[in-house]
Swiss-Prot record:
Induction: Down-regulated by salicylic acid (SA), ethylene, hydrogen peroxide and cold. Up-regulated by NaCl. It holds the Pfam family zf-TAZ. Preferentially expressed in leaves. Gene3D superfamilies: 1.25.40.420, Potassium Channel Kv1.1, Chain A, TAZ domain. Residues 333-355 are annotated as: CaM-binding. This is BTB/POZ and TAZ domain-containing protein 3. Transmembrane segments: none annotated. One of its GO terms (molecular function) is zinc ion binding. It comes from Arabidopsis thaliana. A zinc finger (TAZ-type) spans 232-322.
Amino acid sequence: MSSSTKNIPKPPPLPCITYQRFQSSTRKPSSLMRLVPKEALETWDKLFKEGSGADTYVETDNKSHFPAHSSVLAAASPVIATLLNQSRDKNGNTYLKIHGVPCEAVYMFIRFLYSSCYEEEEMKKFVLHLLVLSHCYSVPSLKRLCVEILDQGWINKENVIDVLQLARNCDVTRICFVCLSMVIKDFKSVSSTEGWKVMKRSNPLLEQELIEAVIESDSRKQERRRKLEEREVYLQLYEAMEALVHICREGCGTIGPRDKALKGSHTVCKFPACKGLEGALRHFLGCKSRASCSHCKRMWQLLQLHSCICDDSNSCKVSLCWNFKEKMKKLSKKEQSKWRLLVENIIRARNSLGPFSSRSSGLI
């Protein structure tokens, strides 16, 4: 056994440097070029800038043009490959016309097709033009880079509407989401910008869509706030019933069972509702007009609610628990369903706290 283990060759060392470099490079699309040797990038960039052996040219606005290599452009973009074939004249010469965007943006676009190189400041300046070009000519790597730049704080309330319309036309879901979130978050400021006013005149359907999104978001916030308020009420009821069981079973402060030693009014209780419930119980026990007293009615309701939740009314220490249990059977089905629904909501609110919440002690 020992001789066989000696013949096992040692494993090769882990490719730590290469692997870590690959991991870090996958975080941002723009850093993928780090996997390509610097010399290779410089060679392709030099080929673009010098135009040696160029067999076509790119025409921009104002009849400006610069040389390019049709094979490189065709390999980088299937759309450009088709356009070059369609532009071929009788002598076999080709050309590519890109109008409607600044010459500098076209130059950066063609340079990126060669070497994926760019100047960061120039990229930020012409990012919207390059996004359009990357979408129109189907260059996914450039499109990802533009999305990355836009998603890094480039968008503000002044340009968010313009960027949103452009992102919708270029099928950039991520940027559409970012813009929509910004509009919803600061609708008052965004709706007063010049971009909004222009969009309102040129694209009223988009304006209506954004307004509806803002209204829907406000409705969701109000609904969420309402549910949180309801949940808080249910939790307070649960805490009140916990304090009721605690007082009736163990005693607390200055009130409790006769066979239990009371802790005194200066004792700090772990049940938050105990102090308020202690005063309510004292009032309830000494009140002469329980039938008409609003405070006593709430105590009756709390006792009845406890009986709906209590699983063992026969041995329960809470006063009148068994009596309310029997009384519940005589109520109409409609009334019973109301109490049952209230109990379900309280239990659901309590369970939403989780087992480690400080608000749940588990007495009931």
